[in-house]
Amino acid sequence: MKYEDLRDFIAQLEARGELKRIAAPVDTHLEMTEIADRVLRAGGPALLFEKPVTKGVPQAIPVLANLFGTPQRVAMGMGEDVADGDWSTPLREVGRLLSFLKEPEPPKGLKDAWEKWPVLKQVLNMAPREVRSAPCQQVVWEGDQVDLGKLPIQHCWPGDAAPLITWGLVVTRGPHKKRQNLGIYRQQVIGRNRVIMRWLAHRGGALDFREHQQAHPGEPFPVTVVLGCDPATILGAVTPVPDTISEYQFAGLLRGAKTELVKCLGSDLQVPASSEIVLEGVIHADDMAPEGPYGDHTGYYNEVADFPVFTIERITMRRDPIYHSTYTGKPPDEPAMLGLALNEVFVPLLQKQFPEITDFYLPPEGCSYRLAVVSMKKQYPGHAKRVMFGIWSFLRQFMYTKFIIVVDDDVNIRDWKEVIWAMTTRVDATRDTTLVDNTPIDYLDFASPVAGLGSKMGIDATNKWPGETNREWGRPIVMDAAVKRRVDEIWSTLGL
């Protein structure tokens, strides 16, 4: 499914019955969250709230919600066609493309080189193109015009500290880097032109800010936030794109057309020309504020902590812009649906590094990253433990995975009944559990003894080989194949 920008994507979703317009007035304070949550849990469409209301005042800008509320729409956002509801297969193809780009193998001969050339050529041809004028700069607010109260920013949960910008694509660049960093960081509104930028210390934006402080102490750090970006660029920011290409280049590859970029009015940062709303401004080194609490994807309110304040100097936008928003809460929520889809992208990446892996699953109930189940073709004693540590260290997306369960390839890891059977019949609690202490842990994980630092557990639920056990290992009960065929033939005559 190829598309030009967010508006074209919305139009195509609506034509397919994947987007519903809400004409009735809906309050951005809690009501919008409740409606979006009910629709998402029912597997419903994306929502365009045409008449949002904030504090009793009608807002002029509509709100787009649940854009990635199903894995099917995530696949569509990645430019894939979803036939007969099968979203897994096209996303595996995206994963195979990423694995090729991440570690391209040298051609094995002239024929192989000829077959790989179209992919490489397409990647090279998708370098973004800079334009001088752009739809996202059709309207400009500066000075006293800058007022976040004019935007329909959601207040998602009763215990939230303030309205929260959720789907903001944050654009930064470190002093020693040519390439811009794109990241999704939530932002608490604390004034008409001030938000708290909640980026964790290891995230790209925070690293760029730290390097800027070291290289240019005391100088403001330019930051831009895009609200309402094309889906491919948003998804590129949360996908393990190889360092050899930019997120903008990868987005063009998904969308089937080069990403057009325009330089911001107040800095050299570049944003997609088709963006709906753009916030331009700076972060001052000594400007910090306590952020939170907020209801998060864990299903709990998080702790309050200090983060930098982003001062907005200018807001540019399209005529009649659309504000893109979401909420996070106990799974399933939109991040959980995104996690289900990205799970399929991860599988080919892992298999490229570990061919013995047959499947990989991040259950949404585990916040889509805290627990992983892996099936593999075991080849030697200790093999499961090697796979555990390999997953923890391979992609930064798995740095916060607290639990990894490894099973043999005879177990369907998408079926908890089979996983529990394997765990209860193939695991000795002492021999088959591996504990690793003092490892990076999600800052939001209040179960860890120290914020950002905790332990991980690996569980080897594979059949044990000689050397791993001294006992005779059990053989699974399997019915004779000929008997099963015979019963299949007579089944209709049994009156059952």
From Swiss-Prot:
Keywords, comma-separated and alphabetical: Cell membrane, Decarboxylase, Flavoprotein, FMN, Lyase, Manganese, Membrane, Metal-binding, Ubiquinone biosynthesis
Primary localization class, coarse: membrane
Gene3D superfamilies, A to Z: Single helix bin, UbiD C-terminal domain-like
GO BP terms in the entry: ubiquinone biosynthetic process
The protein's Enzyme Commission number: 4.1.1.98
Cofactor note as given: Binds 1 prenylated FMN per subunit.
Record-linked InterPro entries: UbiD, UbiD-like_C, UbiD-like_N, UbiD_bacteria, UbiD_Rift_dom
Location(s), subcellular: Cell membrane
UniProt superkingdom: Bacteria
Single GO MF annotation: metal ion binding
Assembly information from the UniProt record: Homohexamer.
Protein name from the UniProt record: 3-octaprenyl-4-hydroxybenzoate carboxy-lyase
Organism: Azoarcus sp. (strain BH72)
Gene name of the encoded protein: ubiD
